[in-house]
Amino acid sequence: MLCNISQFLGMGDVLCLKQSPFSLMNISMSGQFTTHLMVSFFSGLIISSPYIFWELWRFISPAFYTSEAKLARGGVFFSSVLFLMGILFGYYVISPLSLNFLGSYQVSDLVSNQISLTSYISTLVTICFANGIVFELPVLVYFLTKMGLLTPHIMKVYRKHSIVCVLILSAIITPPDISSQILVSFPLIILYELSIKISARIIRRENKK
């Protein structure tokens, strides 16, 4: 489906990984076995992420007032949803873009890309988990605002700087294609705007008390 979307947007096959642009190889006796274990571990970590967030919430909840604790309890659900959305975004959008670009990039025709299995999986895991963490921005903003360390005014002042940083980052990790850059940067900008709304709502609620 993503391949069809990619072609519909005029991006070619940048979201497709039908045929790897490089050959994978194993250069260690136990490389495939340890890679299998690593994939199993991180898969388990992703699946159990709602429970991990719940345990984190149980650890920090005593620091909240009763009314605040009830209000923030839904944060466990939203943290889990945002994290899983980030993982999926990283796996289905960022990974194909990055792997296709990096796998076919050459400084010279004399150098061929033969990527080790461990390097490939490590890159994939890093991309997915990095996106999962980035998608936690609204939750982070919520807690920073509650602690008085962040205000919507500050976020609005640095909005342009943040958008520029997002565009630069998306240009680095994607091929030199404007459609790919928009596809990567748009969800991150939406997250930033959502975080501003969350921060403003918390400030209004605090002012009413």
Language-model features, listed with the residues they occupy:
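Membrane topogenic/interface segments and analogous intrinsically disordered interaction regions
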Residues: M1-K209
